[in-house]
């Protein structure tokens, strides 16, 4: 009788990938990165095990938004005090914190539980081309499609 293979957390081999966001559409790139973080592109993918790889995203400030989203898309934050709701447009967020904008896009595509939070820690986003992870020897990831 055959049984389905279930990956154990300690058996998972993790790689480091680097993704260049220059000229890429935000949502399409974020969904690709979320798949890598979850490990869905590996043959040993197991839903309840963090089998994903580390992802470094560079040039997050040069990511592309389609349509009129620079003006129309709004990010909300709240200070937890009465009247503490703050709004920021995507254009202002791209100028001020492009790394945070990409992180929020990917975070929304990961599971909303402790496993998703653990997967999110493997994402490293940088606005420019400089990053401190050269020692990990990341491989360049070619975007599908």
Curated annotation (Swiss-Prot):
Molecular function GO terms recorded: mRNA binding; structural constituent of ribosome
Entry-linked Gene3D superfamilies: Ribosomal protein L13
Record-linked Pfam families: Ribosomal_L13
Source organism, top-level taxon: Bacteria
Assigned keywords, A-Z: Ribonucleoprotein, Ribosomal protein
GO cellular component: cytosolic large ribosomal subunit
PROSITE patterns cross-referenced by the UniProt entry: RIBOSOMAL_L13
Ribosomal protein listed as a keyword: yes
GO biological process: negative regulation of translation; translation
Keyword presence, Ribosomal protein: yes
HAMAP family: Ribosomal_uL13 (MF_01366)
Quaternary structure annotation from Swiss-Prot or TrEMBL: Part of the 50S ribosomal subunit.
Family membership: Belongs to the universal ribosomal protein uL13 family.
Function of the molecule: This protein is one of the early assembly proteins of the 50S ribosomal subunit, although it is not seen to bind rRNA by itself. It is important during the early stages of 50S assembly.
Protein name listed in UniProt: Large ribosomal subunit protein uL13
Species this chain originates from: Brevibacillus brevis (strain 47 / JCM 6285 / NBRC 100599)
Gene transcribed to yield this protein: rplM
